[in-house]
Amino acid sequence: MTEITGPNRPQPKPVSLDPAKTAVVVLDLNARCHDPEEVCSQLMEPLGGFLERVREASVPVVFTISLQFKGTPLGDAAVPLKRRDTEPVLYPDAFDKFAGGELQAILSGAGTENLIVVGSLTNVAVLYTSTAAARVHRYNVIIPLDGVNAKSTYEHEYAIHQLGILPAGAGDLMRFTKLDMIEFNL
């Protein structure tokens, strides 16, 4: 039996992307993230700056928010992320934000090959959406480790481990980086 010492912890590597073939999906960062008690609140500052860089490179941004919040005060994207009116908000009723087909239609219509996944929780929406992106839709999935989070280190690291070992070649489509290590070839 192999001794298990813990999940793999991928080292972040620089990523250079063609903005014309790249999109960003922002998972479950809605108005509840204004509450400092919510773990997602920790992502507001770093992702706010990152999304400004993304927009300067003309990379499409798509927001997803859980269906339970649609039509409520928590149904809006978190204010610090400065969502533009041109950036769609989808309300899928699943952890996998590809459920229902809207996200895939937007991404394929934009000619997306590279999908940057940010948001919360790593062990829920990030894990399920990234898995579908790689395994089902065959996107190159870029996960900035400082652009996703979970309620505990264990949950975060376990989900990252799972993404790195996906079967059928899907794990090979995962690239782990940091927000400031992502460059766009302009």
Language-model segments: which ranges?
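A cross-domain feature marking catalytic cores of carbohydrate-active enzymes
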Residues: 29, 63-66, 145
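Von Willebrand factor
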Residues: 51-70
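Acidic-leg catalytic submotif of subtilisin-like serine proteases
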Residues: 23-29
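…and closely analogous acidic/polar surface helices at protein-protein or active-site interfaces
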Residues: 37-54
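Short acidic, Gly/Ser-rich segments with clustered Asp/Glu that frequently serve as metal-coordination loops
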Residues: 30-36
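Active-site-adjacent betaalpha module
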Residues: 2-23, 71-186
